[in-house]
Amino acid sequence: GPSPKKEGPKDTFSNIKNNNEFVVNISTYESKDQMNETCMPLESDKSEIDFASLETKASKLVKPKSLKISPINMECILHKIVDLPVVNKGEYNGIIIGKVIGISIEDDYIKDGRVDVKKLKPLARLGYMDYSVIDNIFEMNRPTTK
């Protein structure tokens, strides 16, 4: 999405473009405050992970480290970068598309062979400063033809 920095893309975008690897760390309601700390617009030579006092662990298939606080880590390789129309002059806007090559899920969040989304309470970014937590889950059968 649009970069909060006025001089170009986010550091994360630049790192992915340069290294072709990244980790998607799923944020939960419990970790929302630490996740928010990583949004601090620091200088390029400063680490948002260090700023937020987050611990990392070695990833299994990619060089970038995974966050220990995240119960799900998706290790990815860059597939494609899609440039989008610029909203404000001088800013960058684009989407990174990755191929997931490995997933780590903490056992506590697996129930009957599936991710227990209700226990996980993942965050969803809605836009602006708005977020949501997934805590109301229901199933619906797909319609069939007769």
What are these regions (language model features)?
Residues 1-146:
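Basic, polyanion-binding surface patches
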